[in-house]
Amino acid sequence: MKLSHLLTSAVSVLSLGLTVEGHFSRSRNDAVGPKRPFKPLPYSHPRKKVCHVRSHGDGRDDSAFILSALKSCNNGGKVVFAEEKEYTIGTALDLTFLKHVDLEILGRIQFTNDTDYWQANSFKHTFQNATTFFQLGGEDVNVYGGGTLDGNGQIWYDLYAEDPLILRPILFGVIGLHGGTIGPLKLRYSPQWYQLVANSSDVLFDGIDISGYSKSENEAKNTDGWDTYRSKNIVIQNSVINNGDDCVSFKPNSTEILVQNLYCNGSHGISVGSLGQYIGEVDIVKNVLVYNISMYNASDMARIKVWPGVASAMSEDLQGGGGLGSVSNITYEDMYIENVDWAIEITQCYGQKNMTLCNEYPSNLTISDVYISNMYGTTSSARDPNIGTIVCSSPDVCSNIYVENIDVVSPSGTNDFICTNVNESLLQVNCTSG
């Protein structure tokens, strides 16, 4: 059986939602597969106490009930959100004090649509103006149950269309968590990114079901599935993502990241970056393995995006360029694509439309030891006759980029690549320009 058939079969199970049922296994390492984490994940000890979260059930803020239950069952307990109940959160919750506690979410949690409150009180992070409804952190924390977190995103999609400088909260903020499991869970209608994983380590995401599109003419933008930032030894697996931006994005200083067994639809691919955005900052992404991915109706599959060495403006609320750093030991292996604009995109001119200026100011960030292999499927007509682009801003900042066994064609049957400032002898593709 061809790899594409294997991937499609695996994805059909995911798309039915079967992976979001079940319960948490305390042996995190046994749950990871088929590829193993870069380092063993820590063991989670049994819980000895149970706390049930109360709910008003009428849309009033349940944050006080949630906080009370978490404090009562912290250090060795389990907090249960009942299946038949709906919970409302209207207060920014700092949950970084958690230790040795489980959150079993069986019901539905919805965040209020008070945009003025959330812009003023959500948790602010310096990178790319990120904000979160809440921040969950601490040590040995597990969140599971198959229930739903709803970000009430529609009001934010419409508001962002009017004002691109508003601060839209991220639905699920994992901030400073060391040892934990997230999933199975359903995440719906995030105002911005669905999950930010920052300053964290040894965390497994397993069985996450992401979906939520705009119901108006205003698109749901920047709805990344995951963004890892200043984090290490993170595993993301067995999940279904229907969104409108990166399926997974490895932001600055993400190391030892394993991503496997994902179905991504409507996304911008699985991306390293963007990196090099801030002058004076050193961005490092290394030791990343992406394995067994099905990508549909997307702009990219395998993507590395680096800002040039000169100030650039991607949009009014996203500007940068001139930062330092490196990308190294990145592997993409076994991928199936349908209707994807670029099978592979590597650029060091992210955000800069003036290519002459970009070439005059090459990126300060190097890319080395990249391995992309075993990709099957078809691209969209958007870039036909090209199916990929590997463009470095200077031959001095890219080395050891290997591409092999790419069985992908455009709608017209071509398989051309744009190749610039890269060692073409390491690329088993049809480079037609450079």
UniProtKB/Swiss-Prot annotation:
Lineage: Eukaryota, Fungi, Dikarya, Ascomycota, Pezizomycotina
PbH1 repeats: 231-252, 254-274, 327-348, 362-405
Catalytic activity, EC: 3.2.1.67
Domain of life: Eukaryota
GO biological process: cell wall organization; pectin catabolic process
Role: Specific in hydrolyzing the terminal glycosidic bond of polygalacturonic acid and oligogalacturonates.
Active site feature: 245 (proton donor), 268
Sorted UniProt keywords: Cell wall biogenesis/degradation, Disulfide bond, Glycoprotein, Glycosidase, Hydrolase, Repeat, Secreted, Signal
Disulfide bonds: 247-264, 392-398
Major location category of this protein: secreted
Enzymatic reactions: [(1->4)-alpha-D-galacturonosyl](n) + H2O = alpha-D-galacturonate + [(1->4)-alpha-D-galacturonosyl](n-1)
Compartments (UniProt record): Secreted
Organism: Emericella nidulans (strain FGSC A4 / ATCC 38163 / CBS 112.46 / NRRL 194 / M139)
A Pfam family that the UniProt record links to this protein: Glyco_hydro_28
Thermal dependence of activity, per record: Optimum temperature is 48 degrees Celsius.
Record-linked InterPro entries: Glyco_hydro_28, PbH1, Pectin_lyas_fold, Pectin_lyase_fold/virulence
Protein name stated in the entry: Exopolygalacturonase X-1
pH dependence statement: Optimum pH is 4.4.
Family: Belongs to the glycosyl hydrolase 28 family.
Gene: pgaX-1
GO molecular function: galacturan 1,4-alpha-galacturonidase activity; polygalacturonase activity
Keyword Signal attributed: yes
Residues annotated as signal peptide: 1-22
SUPFAM superfamilies in the record: Pectin lyase-like
GO cellular component: extracellular region
